[in-house]
Amino acid sequence: MEFVRKKLEPHGFSWDFPMAVARRFSIVNSKIVYKKDLVAEYSDYYKRISKANEKKFLALLQKFYADSRFQKFYNNHLPLYKECEEAMQTMVDKIDFGWYDRFFGPKQNCEQNVFLGILIGGANYAVHNKKSAKGKDVEIVDAVMGCCSKRDGRIYYGPEYTLPIIIHEFNHSYCNPLNEEVWEKISDKATELY
């Protein structure tokens, strides 16, 4: 944590960024490795962490993974994770994802995912990445959803607070490019208002 506090936080390692970093790695045979399909220079990723600090962070993360026996912890909590997944799936099944293309127009090469951030409290946010697939860049929007409730002893994501957030986060992949197209025309007024 000292490394994160001293070396990473001053450059924006907060809020959504730990998930952005985590999204770039996977665990293979108890080793944390880079995902090869993600576009390395996408977004502001390397403005917020240098490659040297990323490498150091990865080494510290690997040490934590081994020292904490994280895989055992994860395996012990699989029933909870499965229950959370099933509860969230009931929410995701209610979303008409085709509406986005009908309303905004078709969007090619976009992948949308929901990640469950069980320990982040009520916070919600999105992490954006790109990956190469079949010679094309694919935009990835990961909606990271915070805490859930219990209802009748079961994990519960209420539609009144869950659905609007997921819909909002996935709207960004359609709305942000529209904003970028007209930003020069609206930037003065937008800056004045916000």
Question: Model regions: which residues?
Answer:
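Flexible internal linker/loop segments at domain or repeat junctions
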Residues: 182-194
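Beta-strand/loop-rich accessory regions of lumenal/periplasmic or secreted enzymes
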Residues: 118-120, 151, 155, 171
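Active-site scaffold of zinc-dependent metalloenzymes
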Residues: 43, 124-160
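Solvent-exposed, acidic/flexible segments
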Residues: 89-93, 156-164
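Auxiliary, metal-adjacent structural segments of Zn-dependent hydrolase domains
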Residues: 77-141
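Active-site recognition of the HExxH zinc-binding catalytic motif
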Residues: 160-184
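Non-catalytic architectural context of zinc metalloproteases
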Residues: 1-90
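Ser/Thr/Asn(+Pro)-rich, low-complexity disordered segments
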Residues: 1-11, 95, 99-105, 123-125, ...
